[in-house]
Amino acid sequence: MRPKELIGSKSHEDHGLDSKVPLSFAEMIDLDSINDQDIKDLIIKERAIPVTISIDEGIRPKIIDSCGMTCSFCHNEGTPVASAYSKTTLLPNPRYRGGRVSIFEKTNNVNFIPGTMQPDDNFLDSLLQTKQALGIKEVHLTGGEPTLHPMLPQIVAMAARVDLDVKMTSNGENGKRQIAECASAGLSKINFSIFGTTPEELAMTQHERYQNPALAARKLDALHESINEALIHGLKVDANIVMSSLAHADRVARILDRYGEKVTIRIQNDLNNQRESRLAIYKFLAMVNAEPEELRIDAGTADAKVRYRMPTGEVIIFKQIRKTMLPETCGDCTLNNPTDCKEGYYGTRLYVDTNGKYKIGICLLRMDLTQDIDDFINSTLPGEILQHRERTKPTQTALP
C-alpha cells in the first residue's frame, strides 16, 4: 500500500472520499443507541483521530488449495475444495473429503477447480501482466495454507525479483520448516490467522470428525513455533482473530500476554453478528485502556483499520469494513444489498486452475465474474478498478 498522510479534520470532502461511505464503524454507530458510557467515550475519541489513506495496489494469489485445517467457516478464497473433486466431477457438487468446506461454493457459480501455482514463466507472466494492468505493487499469498507449498520460497523469490512486496496469510501449519528460507527470499510480513487460543477453542471450530483437543494442541504448537520463527527472522507479524462477542475477550488477552509488543493483534468483527461484535470489540478496547491513534483506509477497497495502543505499548488493530462498490460491476448486482453482500469490493485475487490457466477474480460471492487473465485484461474491469481507486483516493496529501 502507498500511504498518504492526512492530519486533522476527517470530513469526506477533505479526504476526497465517497461521501456516501462512512469512514469507519465509529461514524456508522448511533451514540444514542448505546448505554455503555465506556463504549461511547471510545467512539467519540475514534471519530477525532488522524487519518492515513493508502492506495490499494495489491493482489492475492491463491498459490495452493491444500490445508490441514477443517474450519467450518472457510470460504477457501471462493473456490471448491480441490481434493473433493475428480477430473470427471461437475461443479457444483461438493463432497468435502477430509472435512474441509467452501461455504460459498453452492451459490457463487464458481466453474473451475483450483490448481497449484509454480514458480515458472506462467506465474511470472501473470505477475507482470497484473503489474502493468493494475499497477500492482504487493502480492499477498493465500491458500489453502501457503506453508504447505513445497516451493514457497521460490514463489516468494520470483515475486520479490520483480519488485513486489511479498506478504502471506498463514495458520502456521508448516511455517517452522519454511519461514527462514522465505525470509531470505524476500517475504516481508505474515498475517497469522488464529481460530482459537486453547486446544478446546480451536477444536470447536473444526469439522466434527476432527474436534480433538489433542490434535488441536499440536496445531497450536505449530502456530506458536511459526510465529516465533517469523520473529527470529525479522518479519513483521500480525495475529488476526475474530471477536464475535465479549465472551471472546480472553482469547485476545492470551495473545497479548504471550507476545506483547512483538506481534500486532488485529481484531476483526464477525460479519454474521455485526452490531454485537463491534460493540464487544469497543468494550474490550476500553477494558484494556487502549487509546485510538490513527484510522487507515485503503482507497479502492472496503478495507479500513483503526490503530489502538495500550498504556504498556502494545498495538491492537481494529480491522473494519467500510463497504465500497465498483460502480458498474457492483451497481446492478442482485447481491448488492446489506443482507447478501457484507464486504463490498475487497480487491483482486489471482487463481490458477487444474489446467494451468491463470485467472483474476474480484468477488468471492460472484466467482462467475472470474476470468482468464487475458480476458480480464482485455475487459473493462481493469479500467473500472483503476477509476474506482482514483475516485476514492485523497485529493491532497495534507490538510491545513
Task: Kindly label every feature range from the protein language model.
Residues 195-331:
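Radical SAM enzyme [4Fe-4S]-AdoMet core and its adjacent flexible, acidic
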Residues 31-58, 304-327:
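Short, charged low-complexity linear segments at domain edges
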Residues 57-61, 139-141, 166-168, 190-192, ...:
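Hydrophobic faces of well-ordered beta-strands that scaffold small-molecule active sites
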Residues 81-95, 111-125, 144-189, 194-200, ...:
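Canonical radical SAM enzyme core domain
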Residues 75, 131-132, 153-161, 183, ...:
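Surface-exposed amphipathic alpha-helices with a cationic face
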Residues 136, 163-164, 187, 232-236:
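A short helix->loop->beta-strand "cap" motif at the edges of active sites that frequently abuts
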Residues 4-7, 11-16, 271-400:
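Accessory C-terminal segments flanking Radical SAM cores
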Residues 27-37, 47-121, 134:
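Canonical Radical SAM [4Fe-4S] cluster-binding loop centered on the CxxxCxxC motif
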